[in-house]
């Protein structure tokens, strides 16, 4: 009996290890899928907005004309407000999952509080945070100060791929705003405010009605 031992703990440990590996594998697959989706969007936008340097001048002109006819419009993923378009496209940054634009729409607000970039190879860059003026979603940042080797990024707007969606202007296959999202956030806020005011008025009227009914009931008993 002294020489006997149980294999159950070992089996349990092995099972836990297998479960842990399956969980890690699932998380890895999800992460790779998300990275692949972001990479695909970057490639799509880049291909729609810039020409390959190896193409002829005529081809580049034709592509530029086509892009001008059907440019991409970038939208906020939360409230679908237009943020900019591919006519101001400069470049894409796959390492940070961002697109660089020369200008943006009035729906993009800038937080004037400046901070240093924490991104790799961007030492010395001073940034200002960008956010959607409609829903306050963080969109990215704008480069305000850069070292000499990154001067080309200065005053460019860097929008995060995760915060931006796009559609092709003039495309009949895509709908800018669905019926469920017809009212923007400002309209919803105003409607909710009006409903709250109506509820308050009804509450006051109900209280007065009860008061009148109470007085009538007492008057009926005394008559």
Curated annotation (Swiss-Prot):
Keyword list, A-Z: Cell cycle, Cell division, Centromere, Chromosome, Isopeptide bond, Metal-binding, Mitosis, Nucleus, Phosphoprotein, Ubl conjugation, Zinc
One GO MF term: identical protein binding
Positions of region (Disordered): 1-30
InterPro entries reported in the protein's UniProt record: Mis18, Yippee/Mis18/Cereblon
Keyword Zinc annotated: yes
Summary of the function given for this chain in its UniProt record: Required for recruitment of CENPA to centromeres and normal chromosome segregation during mitosis.
Subcellular location: Nucleus; Chromosome; Chromosome, Centromere
Primary location: nucleus
Membrane-spanning segments: none
Name the record gives this protein: Protein Mis18-alpha
Biased composition regions of type Polar residues, renumbered to the chain: 9-18
């Amino acid at each position: 009996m002294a020489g006997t031992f149980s294999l159950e703990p070992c089996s349990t440990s092995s099972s836990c290890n297998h479960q842990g590996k399956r969980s890690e594998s699932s998380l890895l697959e999800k992460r790779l899928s998300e990275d692949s989706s972001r990479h695909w969007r970057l490639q799509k936008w880049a291909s729609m907005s810039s020409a390959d340097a190896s193409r002829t001048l005529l081809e580049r002109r034709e592509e530029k004309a086509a892009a001008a006819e059907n440019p991409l419009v970038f939208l906020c993923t939360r409230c679908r407000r237009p943020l900019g378009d591919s006519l101001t496209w400069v470049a894409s940054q796959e390492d940070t999952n961002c697109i660089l634009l020369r200008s943006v729409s009035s729906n993009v607000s800038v937080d004037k509080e400046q901070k240093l970039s924490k991104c790799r190879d961007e030492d010395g860059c001073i940034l200002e945070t960008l956010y959607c003026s409609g829903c306050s979603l963080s969109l990215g940042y704008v480069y305000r100060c850069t070292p000499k080797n990154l001067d080309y990024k200065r005053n460019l707007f860097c929008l995060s791929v995760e915060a931006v969606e796009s559609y092709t202007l003039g495309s009949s296959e895509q709908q800018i705003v669905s019926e469920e999202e017809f009212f923007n956030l400002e309209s919803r806020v105003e409607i909710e405010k009006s409903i709250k005011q109506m509820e308050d008025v009804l509450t006051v009227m109900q209280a007065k009605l009860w008061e009148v009914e109470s007085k009538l009931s007492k008057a009926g008993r005394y008559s």
